[in-house]
Amino acid sequence: MVLNALDKIEKASKSKGTVTGIPTGFIDLDYKLSGFQPSDFILIAARPSMGKTAFVLNIAQYMAFKKNKAVAIFSLEMSKEQLVNRLFSLESQVDAQSLRTGNMKDSDWEKLIEGAGVIGQSKLIIDDTPGISISELRSKCRKYKLEHGLDIIIIDYLQLMSGSGRGSDSRQQEISDISVSYTHLTLPT
C-alpha cells in the first residue's frame, strides 16, 4: 500500500504538473484535478436544468472521441436516442434544432456523416435501462469491462436509480446508500 502510494507520487513528480489521469477537455478542471483518476468518485451536482447532462456529455465526448477511452454512460433520465442525437450535434457541430427538424445544408450532412463515423468507431456505451439498481449497474460494468475495456463510468442521474431494495427508512437514506455503493464499485483489471 505504501509502496504503491510512493510510486504514484514519483510518477506525478516526473510528469511535472501535467494531467496524470484521464483529461476531461476542460483545462481549468484538469488543472485542479489532474484529470479524472482511477477509482475517483466524482459527483456533479446543480439545480435542475443547469446543464449537468450537457456538461458530462462534453466530458464523455472528449474522453471517448478525442482520447479513445472506453466510456459507459448510464442514463436514467434521457433515452439512448436522445443522448446519441446530442452527441451527433456536439461532434459534428451541427445545430441540435437542425438535427431534430432535418432542415440541414449539404455541408451539415457532410459534418454529420463524419461525426457519425467518429461516434461509431469510439468505445462509448450508452445504457438507458430505467430504474437500474446498483447491483445491475455493477454487473453491466463488469460485462462491459471484459468485452470492451472500461475507463470511466458516468451515471445520469443518481436520484432516479433504485436502491438495494432493503427497505430503507427514507429516500434520502437510499440515495446515501447508493452513493456509498458507487465508491465501492470495483471492476476487474
Which residues does each predicted region cover?
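Short hydrophobic/aromatic beta-strand immediately N-terminal to the Walker A/P-loop
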Residues: 42-43
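Hydrophobic positions on the alpha1 helix immediately C-terminal to the Walker A/P-loop
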Residues: 55
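Conserved small/polar residues in nucleotide/adenosyl-binding loops
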Residues: 182-189
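Conserved lysine of the Walker
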Residues: 52
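Helical hairpin unit composed of two closely spaced alpha helices linked by a short loop
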Residues: 150-181
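Pre-Walker A segment
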Residues: 1-38
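Cytosolic-facing regulatory segments adjacent to core modules
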Residues: 31, 62-149, 163
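P-loop (Walker A) phosphate-binding loop of NTP-binding proteins
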Residues: 47
